[in-house]
Amino acid sequence: MKAIEVDVFGLVQGVGFRWFAQRTAQQHNIVGWVSNQTDGSVKIHAQGSQSDLIDFLSVLEKGPGFYSRVDKVITTNIPLFETNDFAIRG
């Protein structure tokens, strides 16, 4: 089990990215949360197996579709945390 913080930059607000991240997390057995940031980025705390996290990130980097654009993804290891779902926050 591993936990990461993911900062996603680009055109990722107002394009369904948080919903896309939640759906993708659920499909890859990832728990945690996603939130819009004031600088226009999206922050994700994600926890799961190493292979599930790799698969999750590879889908996230593509974005939800035509109206979104992912320019940069920064991933940082963080301590494991307690949750059993993947939530959309503010």
UniProtKB/Swiss-Prot annotation:
It is an enzyme of class 3 (hydrolase). InterPro entries: Acylphosphatase (IPR020456), Acylphosphatase-like_dom (IPR001792), Acylphosphatase-like_dom_sf (IPR036046), Acylphosphatase_CS (IPR017968). It catalyses: an acyl phosphate + H2O = a carboxylate + phosphate + H(+). Its EC number is 3.6.1.7. Signal peptide: none annotated. PROSITE patterns: ACYLPHOSPHATASE_1 (PS00150), ACYLPHOSPHATASE_3 (PS51160). The active site is at residues 18, 36. Residues 3-90 form the Acylphosphatase-like domain. GO terms for molecular function: acylphosphatase activity. Keywords: Hydrolase. Disulfide bonds: none annotated. It holds the Pfam family Acylphosphatase. PANTHER family: ACYLPHOSPHATASE (PTHR47268:SF4). Belongs to the acylphosphatase family. This is Acylphosphatase.
